Each structure stands twice: as C-alpha cells, then as structure tokens.
C-alpha cells in the first residue's frame, strides 16, 4: 500500500429504501424467534412505490402476522405504514436443506459461505475511522429528524466520508458528503446551514475538519421524494454499510433476514467477535479473521487469521488459539452470541458492528486468548 492514500466509507439512515428492507426482514426474523428460538428463517424483502413484497422460507412452530410486522416497521421508520399493498410469499425450508442441516447431533451450516471479521485500533470502536464517522453522520440525521432539531428532515438519507492516511495512520478528512431527504419548499441554503451546524460539526468534534476538507450537502440539490416512492428497496444491497465500508474483503452473503444457522450471519458475527477480542487484548493492531463453511457441515472448512504484520504472536499461533478458544460450529456460535433470541432488528442499522451492546461486540475473551496464544506460540517454538 502507498505511504499516502485515501479510504472512503458510506452509511445510510434507517429510512433508506434498501436499509428499510433489511430492517423489515430482521423484524420478521425476530418475530419468529420470539415464539420459536429454533425457527429457520430466510426472508427477502423488495419494496417500491405502493408495494412491499416479503418472500422466503420459514420453518417455525409459530408464524407471525407478517403484514402487521411490515406495516409497523415501516411506520417506525417514519413513513405511512398503511400506504402500501403488502404481499407475503413464504414456504417451508427445502427438505433437502433441512435434512442436511439437522442430520446430526451438531447443526450443520445452512449453506456454504465465506465470511470475514475485522478490527483495528484506530478508533474506540475498533473499526476504521471512515466507517465510524459515516455512521455518526447518519445517526445524527435520524436524531435530528426525530427530535425535530431540523424540522424539515424526512427519513431517507446517506453520508460518505473520505479520510486521508499517511503510513497507515488517519491524518485528515478530505471529503464529507451528506444527502438528506427534506420537505418541499425548504430553502437549500437554510438546510445546508442546519446540517452543517447540527450534523457535521458534532460528528467531527473528535476528528476536526480543516479548511481544505470538501463538504458537500445535498450536492444534487432538491431531495423531496425519497424512500420507496423514489427508489426500489431490496434486502442485501448495503453489505458494505453493514460491515466495514468496503475496506475489508466480503464473502458476498447478506446479514439481514437470516436466522443463526445461516453462517453468512452467525459466521460474520463470530469473525468480528474474534477479531475484536484479538485487537482488544493487544495481540494485534489490525486483524482479519476468515471463516468458510460447507452446507450440512458443522465445523468450518477454513479458519485463517491475518494480523497484517502487527501481531504480538505469529499468525499460526493466533489461528490455533482461535480454534481452541472459540466454538465455530453453528450451534456454538448461536450459543456464544445468543443468536436464538429476537435481537437482530435492534442492530441492523448504522452498521452491525457499531453497537456496543451487541453480543459480538463484547471484549470478554481477551485474557483467555492471551493465554492460549502464549501456549500455542511456545508449542510452535518447541518443535
């Protein structure tokens, strides 16, 4: 990598059409798990002007009123929940897949998949700075709308932050982009002033902008129509927003709309949990954890740890410690992280890894990891 480079990440508000589809899908998952912790759910949502479609596979002892869940979720995002025709198309999980997943004492992975977890020490959240700043902006947009700090704001919105690095250290913010839906008749200059005062300045208190930072607020001008009326929304289209802003590899599987037997979700959460504890323990400054699974198999077919040359121990020792310390089967990940509980909707906005109270964000394995790494490194050296 060059000595000097720029990294960029984006975020969206909970009223963004794609993210609202994710939220609806996770509300359906939660509604199923609330009554049946063993429910298998794969829910996709597509929405456009006047219509919302939820489709997928649900095998559960109790089925929720999905149209009611959808309308309630849309209302809570700031839109009219009764303004849409709702269509639900669901059926049970394929018996072939169910047989593969449930055939042994250990639940097998619901599909093959590759997932990545990442952590770095450049922010308190142990995430890349552009990711943290972009999510701060969209959180503040939603807060300003709900509290009516900026009364003209409507639910849809996006933000993007570019940070200049030198020798791997963030030095300055080179560009900030904020696009926010607003009521008709608002003067653009007034809106831009309000966003600068109530959104951008508070977001960058800890990492100030400079005179050369390019700040773009609603660069396209008028943004009155938003949400499903302006753009068709679909689950799984904000994968970089959900994870690490495109700054880390991604296996391609979406997080939302899936129960914990789907390793796209449980594996991604576990990989982040592992990486965060490695960095929190001081075992590395940066860490990428890679896991891969085969459908019907409980144990991963790949476990890789890359400390990017910053590790206190060798990557081999870190990998062996991870295999020893963490339960990497679907059952193990579900049990460790409480993924049989209705918790998913709470964490699906503003990135899945920015919520300090999420189970996969806890830094409670640092000491055992340190001990395991020391033992593994000693064993490697003795060979």
Give names to the regions the model predicted.
Residues 186-280:
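Glycine-rich anion/phosphate-binding loop at the beta-strand->alpha-helix junction
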Residues 48, 286, 293-383:
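Internal helix-turn-beta structural module
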Residues 39-43, 157-163, 213-217, 283-294:
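A short glycine-rich, hydrophobically flanked beta-strand micro-motif that places a catalytic Asp/Glu
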Residues 1-40, 375:
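N-terminal, positively charged regions that mediate nucleic acid binding
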Residues 6-13, 51-59, 115, 119-121, ...:
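Short glycine-rich or small-residue beta-strand-to-loop segments that form or flank ligand, phosphate
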Residues 8, 50, 68, 75, ...:
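Glycine-rich, mobile lid/loop segments that gate access to catalytic sites or pores
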Residues 10-12, 16-21, 107-123, 224-248, ...:
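Conserved phosphate/anionic-ligand binding catalytic regions in large, soluble enzymes, centered on
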Residues 42-61, 295-299:
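Short, charge-patterned binding micro-sites
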């Amino acid at each position: 990598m060059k000595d000097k480079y720029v990294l960029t990440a984006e975020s969206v508000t909970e009223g963004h059409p794609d993210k609202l589809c994710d939220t609806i899908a996770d509300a359906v998952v939660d509604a199923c798990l609330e009554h049946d912790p063993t429910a298998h759910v794969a829910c996709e949502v597509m929405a456009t002007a006047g219509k919302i479609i939820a489709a997928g596979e649900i095998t559960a002892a109790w089925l929720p009123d999905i149209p009611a869940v959808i309308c309630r979720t849309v209302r809570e995002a700031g839109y009219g929940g009764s303004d849409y025709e709702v269509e639900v198309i669901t059926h049970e999980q394929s018996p072939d897949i169910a047989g593969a997943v449930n055939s042994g004492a250990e639940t097998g992975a619901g599909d093959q998949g590759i997932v990545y977890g990442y952590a770095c020490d450049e922010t308190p959240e142990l995430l890349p700075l552009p990711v943290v700043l972009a999510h701060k902006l969209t959180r503040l947009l939603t807060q300003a709308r709900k509290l009516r700090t900026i009364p003209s704001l409507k639910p849809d919105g996006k933000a993007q932050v570019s940070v200049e690095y030198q020798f791997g250290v963030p030095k300055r913010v080179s560009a900030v982009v904020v696009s926010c839906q607003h009521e008709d008749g608002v003067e653009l200059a007034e809106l831009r002033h309000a966003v600068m005062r109530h959104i951008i300045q508070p977001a960058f208190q800890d990492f100030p902008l400079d005179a050369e930072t390019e700040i773009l607020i609603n660069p396209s001008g008028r943004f009155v129509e938003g949400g499903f009326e302006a753009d068709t929304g679909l689950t799984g289209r904000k994968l970089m927003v959900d994870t690490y802003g495109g700054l880390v590899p991604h296996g391609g599987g979406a997080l939302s709309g899936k129960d914990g037997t789907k390793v796209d979700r449980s594996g991604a959460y576990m990989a982040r949990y592992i990486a965060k504890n490695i960095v929190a323990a001081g075992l590395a400054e940066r860490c990428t954890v890679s896991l891969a699974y085969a459908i019907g198999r409980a144990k991963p077919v790949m476990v890789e740890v890359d400390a990017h040359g910053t590790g206190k121990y060798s990557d081999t020792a870190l990998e062996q410690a991870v295999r020893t310390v963490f339960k990497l089967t679907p059952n193990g990940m579900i049990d460790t992280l409480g993924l049989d509980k209705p918790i998913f909707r709470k964490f699906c906005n503003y990135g899945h890894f920015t919520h300090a109270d999420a189970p996969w964000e806890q830094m409670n394995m640092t000491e055992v990891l340190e001990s395991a790494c020391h033992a593994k490194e000693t064993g490697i050296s003795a060979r």
